[in-house]
């Protein structure tokens, strides 16, 4: 991919000690022995189970600011109540009824899209941060990586209220960073099947088994507000269990890719974010892998 033919996001090297606990997790200095140890742990966990967590990386005061922003913006969220398969594609009647591409579950959730965040948002600062980008690149062992060009889905808040459920699915991007902003009263647990597919093998049989209730290889993750999760969502199928109670589950989703030209396909963008923009149609056919989305 020749990245010189379009503009890349301009990153900022601002100090991030107003957002990150850099005393405990000195991710701003990757030569620091503590940072090196943290990167090594994350690399090992990502290799083994496709997921790593840095506990309490984001300071409580930053979490409070993002929580307040999400609550202010909740009326601008796109709320979906529809059905989708794990690939966010339309039904294909040419496939047999038992194929996972024909397995649809009802999803209820909302997204506060990236393009409606406040200019001074902590989440914008996180996504603009060269410090975080370098740390994430080191953890995933991939360089260079880039911020996602998708103007709606690059770093939204996901919001789930009482009764909401986000079914099994794969991500359309390479790497997702999740920061829990607010836990639900009950439920809202993250479940995933690590590395269940690869660019060489969609592994439809194993995917189908989990869709129909199988638990082999499924892991459950309990995040706390301020925790940062690194996740290979392109290859690990995942879901969020049903939320219960008055307190919304809110999570920030900064998203990164190896190919900066990619964006969501129009169908996925409409399902998740309520609309598709010209960029989604212009780049629809561009994919760096041959996977079903």
Please report, for each region that a protein language model flagged, where it lies by residue.
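Signature of the catalytic double-stranded beta-helix
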Residues: 58-59, 65-77, 97-150
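Fe(II)/2-oxoglutarate
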Residues: 1-48, 276-293
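Long, compositionally biased
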Residues: 89, 93-97, 175
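Short, solvent-exposed beta-strand-terminating loops
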Residues: 68, 72-90, 193
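Short functional linear motifs
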Residues: 43, 63-64
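Catalytic core of Fe(II)/2-oxoglutarate
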Residues: 189-195, 199-293
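Short amphipathic
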Residues: 52-58
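Catalytic core of non-heme Fe(II) oxygenases with the double-stranded beta-helix
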Residues: 117-124, 133-228
């Amino acid at each position: 991919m020749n990245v010189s033919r379009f503009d890349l996001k301009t990153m900022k090297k601002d100090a991030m000690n107003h957002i990150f606990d850099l005393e405990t997790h000195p991710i701003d200095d990757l030569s620091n022995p503590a940072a090196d140890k943290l990167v090594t742990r994350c690399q090992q966990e990502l290799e083994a189970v496709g997921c790593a967590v840095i506990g309490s990386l984001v300071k409580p005061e930053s979490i409070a600011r993002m929580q307040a922003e999400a609550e202010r913006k909740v009326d601008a969220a796109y709320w979906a109540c529809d059905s989708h398969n794990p690939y966010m594609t339309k039904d294909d009647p040419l496939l047999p009824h038992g194929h996972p591409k024909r397995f649809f579950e009802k999803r209820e959730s909302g997204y506060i899209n990236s393009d409606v965040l406040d200019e001074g948002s902590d989440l914008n600062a996180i996504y603009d941060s060269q410090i975080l980008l370098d740390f994430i690149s080191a953890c995933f062992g991939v360089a260079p990586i880039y911020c996602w060009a998708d103007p709606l889905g690059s770093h939204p808040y996901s919001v789930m209220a009482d009764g909401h459920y986000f079914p099994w699915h794969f991500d359309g991007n390479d790497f997702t960073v999740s920061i829990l902003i607010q836990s639900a009263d009950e439920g809202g647990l993250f479940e995933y099947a690590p590395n269940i597919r690869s660019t060489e093998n969609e592994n439809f049989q194993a995917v189908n088994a989990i869709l129909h209730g199988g638990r082999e290889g499924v892991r459950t993750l309990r995040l706390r507000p301020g925790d940062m999760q690194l996740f290979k969502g392109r290859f690990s199928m995942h879901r969020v269990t049903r939320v219960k109670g008055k307190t919304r589950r809110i999570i920030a989703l900064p998203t990164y890719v190896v190919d900066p030209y990619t964006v969501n396909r129009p169908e996925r963008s409409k399902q998740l974010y309520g609309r598709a923009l010209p960029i989604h149609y212009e780049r629809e056919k561009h994919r760096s892998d041959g996977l079903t989305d």
